[in-house]
Design a protein with these regions (language model features):
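Helix-biased detector of long, well-ordered alpha-helical tracts
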Residues: 1-214
Length: 214
């Protein structure tokens, strides 16, 4: 880790770096009633690594974290947030390279993640008409989990099983990644010369993902 320096030095000889940034803002993406700080830390990391994987990354180098917090934020909240961040990095790879902290009116977690591009180059623009679309995970569960946690009335007239409620909340608070999907794509190529494939992250919903690929 290089958290004591102003910059992180990364060796990338003969490698292509993938870089992305994602932010979670209080009262826009989360609040203390919908998700605990530990799960929020996990989710913040997963959101970024998911973008890396959907762009062809086969290895996450690390992340930088910019944290903006109100002055009244309790230290225990910060510790739990970083425990969630650490747990996600240990499971999916990468280290904390550095970051920044500042005061603000609402809690904001902004993460920049760096990964190394693998054999496949994945771009939204590479999707072609007539191609088969593959998806990972179960779409809609995270949205339902958010609605349940937010106590929205939209689902009140629908009978939901305890199992579905638990699974939906879990998908919202602790989303999963499918890092082996790229290896499986490599094995299914009809032509080994194929390097570019259309792909996008679908955390904003299946419909939005399809629009991005169209």
């Amino acid at each position: 880790n290089q958290t004591s320096d102003d910059c992180a030095l990364i060796k990338a000889i003969n490698e292509k770096l993938l870089i992305n940034n994602d932010s979670l803002v209080e009262n826009v993406h989360f609040n203390d009633f919908t998700i605990c700080p530990h799960d929020l830390g996990w989710k913040a990391v997963i959101s970024n690594i998911s973008d890396l994987i959907s762009s062809g990354s086969h290895k996450t180098i690390g992340i930088t974290i910019s944290l903006i917090l109100p002055v009244k934020t309790e230290w225990e909240w910060v510790e739990e947030l970083y425990k969630g961040i650490d747990k996600a990095l240990k499971k999916y790879g990468g280290i904390i390279l550095g970051g920044d902290c500042s005061l603000g009116n609402v809690k904001t977690i902004s993460i920049t993640a760096l990964g190394i591009q693998g054999e496949l180059e994945l771009h939204r623009s590479a999707c072609k008409p007539g191609e088969i679309i593959l998806t990972t995970g179960i779409h809609g569960l995270s949205k339902l989990g958010f609605m349940i946690q937010s106590k929205l009335n939209s689902y009140n007239n629908v009978s939901l099983s305890e199992r579905l409620i638990k699974k939906s909340i879990d998908h919202f608070c602790r989303p999963r990644l499918y890092p082996n999907i790229l290896k499986k794509l490599l094995k299914t190529r009809p032509n080994k010369k194929i390097k570019k494939i259309g792909c996008t992250d679908s955390s904003d919903g299946l419909f939005q993902a399809l629009q991005d690929l169209a």
